[in-house]
A protein has these predicted regions:
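N-terminal leader/targeting and pre-domain segments
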Residues: 1-34
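Glycan-recognition and catalytic cores of secretory/periplasmic carbohydrate-active enzymes
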Residues: 2-14, 41-43, 48, 52-64, ...
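Conserved alpha/beta-hydrolase
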Residues: 73-76
C-alpha cells in the first residue's frame, strides 16, 4: 500500500514503491553513513507534470530499483515546506535534485522522462562515488560563496526606489494583451496592485488602463474558469490562453484584492470601457471567484480554506452539465496557514467593498481556526494543518500573513482583540526571526527578518537562513500599520530597517519587487490615518466611509470610549464628541468630523498637502 505520508498521482502509478523518506536529520544521517547521494523530489499535489513523473519515470521498474539501491530518496511537498523549495527548486515542479549527503546540490532538473532518468541516475552515482572528496570540498566552497552573496549591505530609502520599480512595471507591460512579459503569463498581482496604488497617487490614466486591461483579459480569457468561476494558476501563451488548470487558494487570494481595488476605483463598472450592456463587470468576476472559493475550497464545518483543486485539462473544458457527470479533480483539503490568512484578508475587504457581510463572518471564523488550531502559544503559527493536527513550525511567512490578517480584522470589525493578537505575533517575529547581528532585535538598524526562525535545522541548505523580500515586505507593512495604530515609534523604525535591508538588492528584481515599492512609498509618504471615536453601532457610517476612502493607503480603527479609554489617552484623542472621525497625515490632524459625507473631502484636502506626486509614465 502507498505510504500515506506522501501524495502521489491520483492515476495508476508505482511511485510509492520507491522507498521515500521525509526531509529529516535521520534521512541525511542515513545518507552519510551509507555513503549514498540523495535524490530529492520536490512535488505538489496540484502539479500536472509531478503526476506525469509519478506515472512514468517513478513507475519504471528499472528506475525504482536503481533509486532504492543507490540513493536515499527524499520526497518533499512544496506547499508544506516552502523553505526547502526556496533552497532547492531547479526552476519548476517537479524538481529532481541530486544532493550530497551534506545537502549540497550535485545536479538537478525538473521533469525527467524515463529514458533520460535511466541514463542520469548511474551518471550521478558514479560521479559522486568517484569524486567524493572533490565534491565535498567544492560544496563547502559554494556554500561560503553563497553566504557571502547573501550578506548584502543595507541602504537608505528614497523616492527613487518607488520610481524605479514602477518604471520597470510600465516597461514590462504588454500593451496588446495586458499583463507583463510574454509567455508564459502569470498574474503578477503585486505589479497590478502597484499600478492601482500609483494611479491613486497621481491619477495618471495610463496606469489605470494597464491594470484594467490586464484584469479584463485575464477575467474574460481562458485563465478564468468561465463555468465555475475562479482563476487557474497561469497561462502558457501570451494572450492568456492554454492555461495550466490548477486552481490555487494562494493565487485567487492574491488576485481578489486587485479586483476589489479596481471595483472601488471604477465604481464597480466593467474593467474596460469596451464592455457594455449585459457583459459582466469587475464586480461579477470578483463575486464569481468568491462563490467558487465558498463552494469548493472552504471547509463548511471548521471554517478554514482548502489549499487547491487539481489540474485536469479535459475536465475543465467540459460544460457545467458535462462536469456534473465527470469525476471532479482532486481537492487538497489541507489548511495552509499563510494562504488562509491571505484569503481571510480578501474576504474581509470584500465584505464592505461588495456589501457581502457574510464574507466578513466567514473570514473571522477562518481566522479563529488559525488562532485556535494552528498556533502554539510560545512558538507561533504552524505552516499547515492536515486534519491530524498542525505541522511544521518556524516559517516567517505564516507569522507575517497571519499578523496582517489580524490587522485587517481589527480594521474591518473594530474589535481590539485582533490588534492585541497582531502585536503578540509581531513581538514573536522580532524575537525569533530578526537578524540579531544587525540589531533588528533591539529596534536598531537591521538587515530584516530570516525566512526560518532561530531554531535552525542542521540539514543541508536549511543551515543557512535566507531573507525573502516578499515576506519582509509583509512584515514591514505589519510594523508600519502597528505604528499608525498605536503611535509606537519603535514599530516604524523596525519597518524602516526591514525595508532598508533590500535597498541594494531590489534593482536586480525589477517588477518582481512591486510589493516592496509600495511599502517603501507608504513609509516615506504617510497614509491616511483615521481614528473613529464611538461605539461600533453609532460609528458604523463613519467607519464605512473611512474604509471606502479613495486614497493610496489608509489605516482605520474604531475606538469605543467605554472599552478603549486607555488607547484614546495614548493617542491623545478625546472621548467626545462621539461618534467622530479624526483624520491624520503624519503630524497633521483634522478637527473632529461627524458627518460621513464630509470625511472624504477632509482627507482629500489633507492628502494634497502631504503627498508628493508619483513618477510620470
Amino acid at each position: 500500500m502507498p505510504d500515506t505520508k506522501f501524495h502521489f498521482s491520483p492515476r495508476p502509478n508505482r511511485a510509492h514503491e520507491i522507498q521515500w523518506r521525509e526531509w529529516s536529520d535521520d534521512a541525511f544521517r542515513e545518507a552519510q553513513e551509507s555513503g549514498k547521494p540523495v535524490l530529492l523530489s520536490l512535488s505538489a499535489v496540484w502539479c500536472h507534470w509531478c503526476h506525469v513523473m509519478d506515472e512514468t519515470s517513478y513507475s519504471d521498474e528499472g528506475v525504482i530499483g536503481f533509486i532504492n539501491q543507490h540513493f536515499i530518496p527524499i520526497r518533499v511537498d512544496n506547499d508544506q515546506r516552502p523553505d526547502v523549495n526556496a533552497r532547492y527548486n531547479m526552476g519548476g515542479w517537479p524538481t529532481t535534485a541530486f544532493l550530497t549527503p551534506e545537502g549540497e546540490i550535485l545536479a538537478g532538473a525538473t521533469y525527467v522522462p524515463p529514458d533520460q532518468m535511466k541514463e542520469l541516475l548511474p551518471k550521478v552515482n558514479v560521479h559522486y562515488q568517484s569524486n567524493r572528496n572533490e565534491v565535498t570540498n567544492k560544496a563547502l566552497e559554494l556554500r561560503q560563496r553563497r553566504l557571502t552573496a547573501m550578506s548584502g549591505e543595507r541602504g537608505e530609502l528614497s523616492p527613487r526606489i518607488f520610481d524605479d520599480i514602477l518604471r520597470s512595471v510600465v516597461e514590462n507591460y504588454d500593451p496588446v494583451f495586458g499583463g507583463f512579459g510574454e509567455a508564459p503569463k502569470f498574474p503578477h498581482t503585486d505589479a497590478i496592485d502597484l499600478l492601482l496604488y500609483a494611479y491613486r497617487r497621481n491619477r495618471d490614466p495610463d496606469l489605470l488602463h494597464m491594470a484594467r486591461k490586464t484584469l479584463d483579459f485575464m477575467s474574460r480569457g481562458d485563465v478564468f474558469d468561465q463555468e465555475w468561476g475562479g482563476f487557474f494558476r497561469y497561462a502558457t501563451r501570451r494572450d492568456w490562453s492554454e492555461p495550466h488548470y490548477e486552481k490555487m487558494l494562494e493565487d485567487n487570494a492574491k488576485l481578489l484584492p486587485n479586483l476589489l481595488a479596481l471595483a472601488r476605483i471604477t465604481n464597480h463598472q466593467s474593467p474596460l470601457s469596451r464592455a457594455s450592456g449585459d457583459e459582466p463587470g469587475v464586480r461579477d468576476f470578483a463575486d464569481r471567484t468568491f462563490d467558487y472559493v465558498e463552494w469548493k475550497l472552504r471547509d463548511k464545518e471548521k471554517g478554514f480554506f482548502y489549499g487547491s483543486q487539481d489540474a485536469d485539462e479535459e475536465f475543465y473544458k467540459l460544460s457545467k452539465e458535462g462536469r456534473e457527470r465527470a469525476e471532479e479533480p482532486y481537492i487538497d483539503r489541507t489548511c495552509y496557514v499563510s494562504w488562509n490568512a491571505m484569503m481571510i484578508s480578501a474576504y474581509l475587504e470584500a465584505s464592505w467593498t461588495l456589501d457581502r457581510p457574510e464574507l466578513r463572518d466567514a473570514g473571522q471564523r477562518a481566522l479563529e481556526f488559525l488562532w485556535d488550531e494552528c498556533r502554539d502559544a510560545q512558538r507561533g503559527m504552524y505552516r499547515f494543518h492536515d486534519g491530524s493536527g498542525p505541522q511544521v513550525l518556524g516559517l516567517l511567512g505564516d507569522q507575517a500573513h497571519t499578523a496582517k490578517a489580524l490587522l485587517d480584522a481589527h480594521e474591518v470589525t473594530g474589535e481590539s482583540m485582533y490588534l492585541e493578537r497582531a502585536r503578540e505575533l509581531a513581538r514573536f517575529i522580532v524575537e525569533r526571526f530578526a537578524d540579531r547581528e544587525n540589531g533588528a532585535r533591539t529596534g536598531g538598524r537591521s538587515a530584516g527578518f530570516y525566512d526560518v526562525w532561530d531554531q535552525v535545522e542542521d540539514v543541508g541548505r536549511l543551515k543557512d537562513r535566507q531573507k525573502s523580500i516578499q515576506d519582509n515586505t509583509v512584515c514591514a507593512e505589519v510594523f508600519l500599520r502597528l505604528h499608525h495604530l498605536t503611535r509606537e515609534d519603535k514599530s516604524r523604525e523596525i519597518a524602516r530597517a526591514t525595508l532598508e535591508a533590500f535597498v541594494s538588492g531590489y534593482p536586480h528584481m525589477g517588477y518582481f519587487a512591486a510589493g516592496y515599492a509600495r511599502q517603501v512609498d507608504t513609509l516615506l509618504n504617510p497614509p491616511a490615518e483615521v481614528n473613529i471615536v464611538g461605539s461600533a453601532a453609532l460609528a458604523a457610517e463613519l467607519h464605512r466611509a473611512a474604509l471606502a476612502l479613495d486614497v493610496p493607503s489608509r489605516v482605520v480603527q474604531v475606538l469605543d470610549p467605554a472599552r478603549d479609554a486607555a488607547r484614546l489617552e495614548a493617542l491623545s484623542l478625546p472621548a467626545e464628541p462621539a461618534p467622530a472621525a479624526y483624520a491624520c497625515f503624519g503630524t497633521m490632524c483634522s478637527a473632529p468630523v461627524t458627518q460621513p459625507e464630509a470625511l472624504a473631502e477632509t482627507v482629500r484636502q489633507m492628502q494634497q498637502a502631504a503627498v508628493r506626486p508619483a513618477a510620470a509614465t
